[in-house]
Every structure is written in structure tokens, then in C-alpha cells.
């Protein structure tokens, strides 16, 4: 998970270990919602174990948007960027473990380390690429 994450986001391992030292390990059960539609959640997650899925409901039908695997990040774009309620659900597909940090704590790290600030920029660059990628 560490090597995958560092390669994907071009982050030195020592910087990732610094980030992890500020994050809390959290566990989720199969089917548990990490973020619910209509909820405000500005936390930032790094998936250690398990699979997560983001989806929204249309007329009772679940429409999947993306899946996250170990080494991937996950967060509510609306909650993180604008402190708005989420328009999607993020669910743990199976038993999962993630690292979690609040937006204010993460932004404090960004302001104290150029490696962390660059990491933050790359996260959002990856988000833009995922939105623009043809399916």
C-alpha cells in the first residue's frame, strides 16, 4: 500500500510516514457508509485495506461512480472543497481499514511542508484526470 501510494502521488516515503503519523486508523464493516448523501464530511481518507465504492441513487437505483482500493485516497469533494453536503454515498464494500485526517489538520501539514503541499496539489490533479478520463 505504501509503495503504491508513493508511486501514484510521487510522494517520498518519509513524507507519507509523516502524514500517517497525523492520521487516525479507522475500521469499517462490510456495507457501512463512510459518507452518506446529505452529510457534511470534510475528512480525507487513505485506504489501507479493503474496497470502497462511491455511488448515488436515482429512482432507487444505485449508480456507481468509482471504486477505491488500498493505496487510494477517498473524500467527499463537496465536503472537502466547499464544506457542503455530499451528493454521493461512499460505502465500504468489505471489511476495511483506512487512515483519516480532518481538513484543518491536513491543511496545516500542507502549510508546513513543501512535499506535503505538492502532495495536496497532486491529489487534486489526479481527481481532475479521473473526471476527464473516458470510461
Segment roles from a protein language model:
Residues 1-135:
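Cytosolic regulatory regions built on CNB/CRP/Popeye-like sensor folds
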